[in-house]
């Protein structure tokens, strides 16, 4: 289990990553008119499995308010074949992803963003400035009543004002599986 912390308000880094649909995606391809959510996830780790339905639900709700979303899989697929490209396709189909799911084979994008765990959330305003570096909600491994909607509320605020909340709780998940 890892918690993330990160400086706020740096600019989103561009990328060119292959999606499970065969397309190559850049930041411009997924940017929403009100902001962008970049999520680092994988297919097999328990924190992602426990929260993926909520992540998909929130991404769908965010699209309605002008926030574009992309999910990036940064793990070493040679050491962790559960995160292979083919398994990414099956995972996205199983959970009904409505947003691009791409692979960061070189892990350069994950390093550039400072991603540390899966899931890990980076919320940017319309000017591509990082405004949210926090958790999905307070539920952790199991969905619980009254867990709140930290990510959704933060991104809604960003869509409305261009600025994220002052109080942010770090994301928690399994560490990214880096290549040696």
Where are these regions (language model features)?
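A short, charged, Gly/Pro-tolerant segment at domain boundaries
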Residues: 170-180
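Chalcogenol-based redox active-site neighborhoods
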Residues: 1-167, 175
């Amino acid at each position: 289990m890892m918690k993330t912390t990160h400086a706020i308000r740096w600019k989103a880094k561009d990328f060119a990553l292959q999606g499970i649909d065969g397309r190559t995606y850049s930041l411009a391809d997924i940017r929403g008119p009100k902001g962008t959510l970049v999520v680092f996830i994988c297919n097999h780790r328990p924190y992602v499995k426990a929260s993926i339905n909520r992540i998909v639900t929130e991404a769908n709700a965010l699209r309605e308010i002008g926030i574009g979303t992309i999910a990036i899989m940064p793990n070493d697929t040679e050491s962790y074949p559960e995160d292979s490209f083919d398994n990414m396709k099956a995972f996205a189909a199983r959970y009904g992803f409505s947003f691009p799911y791409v692979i960061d084979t070189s892990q350069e994008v994950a390093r550039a963003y400072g991603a540390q765990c899966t899931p890990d959330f980076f919320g940017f305003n319309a000017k591509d400035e990082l405004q949210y570096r926090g958790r999905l909600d307070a539920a952790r491994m199991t969905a619980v009543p009254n867990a709140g909607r930290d990510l959704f509320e933060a991104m809604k605020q960003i869509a409305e004002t261009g600025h994220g909340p002052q109080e942010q709780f770090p994301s928690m998940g399994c560490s990214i599986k880096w290549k040696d």
